[in-house]
């Protein structure tokens, strides 16, 4: 169960990140490294996390022309990360280029990370989409992007848990959904707009839950993580 909870290391430097990891590594085995931390600390941080036997989701949301994304992704795969993402809005050619890089890595190394397409950020809502010119419903856009990601051969998507059931109905239950914007009832939403509880997210079929500030900003991070894990365990064992 601990592998289905991904704790986001949304901090500015390695010292802060490793403090969090040291406190949580006995209860959580999967950590997300985003732009802020990776751009400061670089690949050495990934090595340090992997040397502790931990899983790493490298959340850089690549978005560029297909050739550039393919070359960048090859370098990220060589870091031995377990999960990486690219923006699905980059289009079919970019998504397919990413798939081909993964396929080459599988042939060359016998393994490759989970590669995800990012649909619509959980900090956005319908109004946010309309402000940048989208005239369709948010859920329709998510469905289109998820379908294109699957057709390109990638493993799954990053999306709000609110869209998980829709995504699974279109792409199948084996298509992976990684869901940020997860909050227990007593937690603040911060800048997230499309949020759900761990219980509801799992009931809808989410495969991985990403949680940042409610855990890493808690006075007792280990206890906060355990509360999330207990709620998740309760759903899977029918006690909630």
Curated annotation (Swiss-Prot):
Membrane-spanning segments: none
Reaction equation(s) it catalyzes: orotidine 5'-phosphate + H(+) = UMP + CO2
This protein's record includes keyword Lyase: yes
Assigned keywords, A-Z: Decarboxylase, Lyase, Pyrimidine biosynthesis
Binding, substrate: 10, 32, 59-68, 122, 183, 192, 212-213
Keyword Lyase belongs to the record: yes
GO cellular component term, pick one: cytosol
Gene3D superfamilies: Aldolase class I
Assigned protein family: Belongs to the OMP decarboxylase family. Type 1 subfamily.
Self-association state and partner proteins as the record states: Homodimer.
Name of this protein: Orotidine 5'-phosphate decarboxylase
Organism: Carboxydothermus hydrogenoformans (strain ATCC BAA-161 / DSM 6008 / Z-2901)
GN (gene name): pyrF
